[in-house]
Amino acid sequence: MSPTSDDADVLFRDGLVTSETVSLAKVYGIHHPLDRMAVTANGNLQRLFSSYYDAPVRVIVDYSRPIVNHNSNHHQWERRVHLTVFDQTFCTADSTVQVHSKEAQALVESGTVGLGQLFRYLDILPEFALQAAGPTPEGGFWRNYTLDCPLVTCSIREVFCPGVWDLQKPQQQSTRDRDR
């Protein structure tokens, strides 16, 4: 769902994400409180999920490839990553990254830095703008947003699996079961 321009103005003026008359649930159809927290995460999603599960979140890069654009002076990449916890993918993120500096370009080209980490390396808090969000037919949710600063601009679409807050750590096999 995309908010109307009036709703968006109310929701996101000065970082405000709810108001007395407008809510994320009403505008985007996102009703679970933890889903709403994830929808408004501004570059710290990996840390939020790691804290929730008390386990490391891995970012698995499917691809990160340059986009050739002869009409632009900026370097661009398209990326797809999967965020996993307990070896289970809970989010797939597709993004377009446009860099405006050599420092940001080197970090993106390295392929070792996630987008949230990129801003930390650059010591910059990006401007977060939620463009749209909503539930998926399968029971998960999605969001489209941008992270922007003078050195880099990221346009990101994330799709979260159903039951994203109910993932289970695989059961450890007991010593007795392994020895059989």
Region locations from a protein language model:
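Composition-driven recognition of glycine/serine/threonine/acidic- and proline-rich low-complexity segments
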Residues: 2-180
